[in-house]
């Protein structure tokens, strides 16, 4: 625990908690409440001028790229650390968070946002709101290039740097560029849906499929679903491609939502699963809970196959739609999805109204070496870091989350014998934990203290099953899984705890409590109905 001017490495709590408040190997911080003030967050105003004033000239500048779980939580942890400004320790640095979006997205609750069970302000609050009680600055721009002040090339050809540098950022509206100076840099840009690489390319997918990875994707799906309500046809079909967590959760949420929504009760959902396999990384208990829920959804069918191509249907499109398969889709477009099954036979899904795409995520990084000087893993394209999350060869740059991969050196009698890259799961849980370590290590680097190796502690997995049901897989065995309404409540509480700020927790928690207090009998009836529904489905 950071408890004195002569700070030591964080204590390693031994008590495990599903909510993550105490974790083996997780740094424990004490908030710096002495210097807290209203943040100078701004989406438009230049901030570099402030950093050149005499007041701030000597302060270190920490720039965090990416405002997802890794980047935002790292910036908040840096702000909460104790910066004592005595005994040789450095004063609190200027922390700047840069992201191209105006809002943070709590991705595990995207499903509730899609089905209108939660509001946008609950799932996607603005950065300005989240940072208003911190000293973290926010700039809404896109990072396009990183220019270290100095780069040396070793005899082996490896690039190294021990200095700060500049990030070139671009305004999406004006296309104007600006240079942001950093002494220390954190890269946490997350993942994007890849439609174009040789590995993930599927003809027609980029033009006709809707990815499920961001706030705009959710809004586009809602718009298409509203349009589906108005379609007067006997058969309406929604395809969900991918049967990992995102695909299974999305399919179940849509199925349970459509069952009770007028105008959508006749929609059929097709879940396309490679080799017919569901939730490859889930436990036995988690897979069983998902299969049970999927099996009870009368409007949902699981299909074995991989998508080979998507084309505009020539016989099912409305009269307002062109039959040209290469043109952009409109709200009336019908699609044909061509599948290759595990036995190499073919199947075609005809006249599909909407195709939801949950596969093909890749690191969100520039591909040009001149724009992005860091070494990247050949297989995944992710930035290579050591165990402390420090980027290989760059003493003042750290990376975490979906855009990084750790490379471990196996040693025998003190000598490095081999290298092995360890890819952590691309989940919010990993980024949530890594943010603590990254913030601590930035503090340590600034104050010339030892860095702490990141050790991920798996705390189990949670998934929604739709309509106030969920499954929680505990990290104590393959069968230890809780599902149903109780798991739904536990999942809600866990995510409430993991909200980025206390203000956001209070905002959401008070709203849930207010809804219960306003109509307690309806709440009790809803719980009883959920339990009875779950019991009848078992």
Predicted feature residues:
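Rossmann-like dinucleotide-binding core of oxidoreductases
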Residues: 222, 234-293, 300-301, 424-445, ...
